[in-house]
């Protein structure tokens, strides 16, 4: 007898979550291995007097976070998290990283023990020993195997079906390949690697570098300076991974889409760069700019810089990571944006 089709639940429905829902919804219709209905948990909001779940389920569009892109009709929005994840075989986590503890606590015990997860969340957390990856939190709280997906994937371009690549990191290769089957399309090409922790760290740390790139744009520094920010940022990403990753760190992983490609696209096209440029030019706070420019969605770069700063400070390593440190101090300690340039001029890479 054929195995029952695998039920998929997407935990999150922001800009990226909705773009991924479009891919998964279309793919499961063609693949017998997966159940044809995809549940998507939506943090309920009212938009123009209507519930967001009602808009998605009736108009098949997330008008708040992914306007202009129709979602497949087999994607069902649900506001009750416990009901959405009930009996799910495959969980796709795509929420702001600061909510992961609360979400895991709410759904632990409601998901089958054999369920598998994949996190698309770009961020890190702090534990008593320092760095804690989002995948570690999900694994520890829920007791399920978890893969990660990171890459040069600006959500609106993915939703518009423009060609891009991405990387899945999985400690159990078979599980990574299953998620590849669920997610790959002719225009969304996936490579699976086993260096999962490095893949995940790339996704978090590149947002800090993108904030630095945005500061340079705000200061009108030019392309050469921005290229230096990208290169020095990449060097700090590699150094950070070598210090804090528990397993082997392969330099080749930084050449995958999750590494240098994601870093480039985020430093030229992402919202971390855009908001950082506005921060440098207007003098407004990050919080004010989030409200104005992002519909209130949280920016990952500044928050990740704060977590990285505390982890580095605890280990006495701030002087080894001047770019990461400068981004934090400019965002949160009222240091002048011009300090971005000083940190480049005196970077230990040049001594």
Curated annotation (Swiss-Prot):
GO MF terms, alphabetically ordered: glycerol-3-phosphate dehydrogenase (NAD+) activity; NAD binding; protein homodimerization activity; sodium channel regulator activity; transmembrane transporter binding
Binding site for substrate: 122, 271-272
UniProt note on tissues of expression: Most highly expressed in heart tissue, with lower levels in the skeletal muscle, kidney, lung and other organs.
Positions contributing to NAD(+) binding: 12-17, 155, 271, 298, 300
E.C. numbers: 1.1.1.8
Any Pfam family matching the protein: NAD_Gly3P_dh_N
InterPro entries in the record: 6-PGluconate_DH-like_C_sf, 6PGD_dom2, G3P_DH_NAD-dep, G3P_DH_NAD-dep_C, G3P_DH_NAD-dep_euk, G3P_DH_NAD-dep_N, NAD(P)-bd_dom_sf
Active site per the UniProt annotation: 206 (proton acceptor)
GO cellular component, as recorded: cytosol; extracellular exosome; plasma membrane
Disease (UniProt): Brugada syndrome 2: A tachyarrhythmia characterized by right bundle branch block and ST segment elevation on an electrocardiogram (ECG). It can cause the ventricles to beat so fast that the blood is prevented from circulating efficiently in the body. When this situation occurs, the individual will faint and may die in a few minutes if the heart is not reset.
Subunit structure: Interacts with SCN5A.
Protein name: Glycerol-3-phosphate dehydrogenase 1-like protein
Organism the protein comes from: Homo sapiens
Lineage per the UniProt record: Eukaryota, Metazoa, Chordata, Craniata, Vertebrata
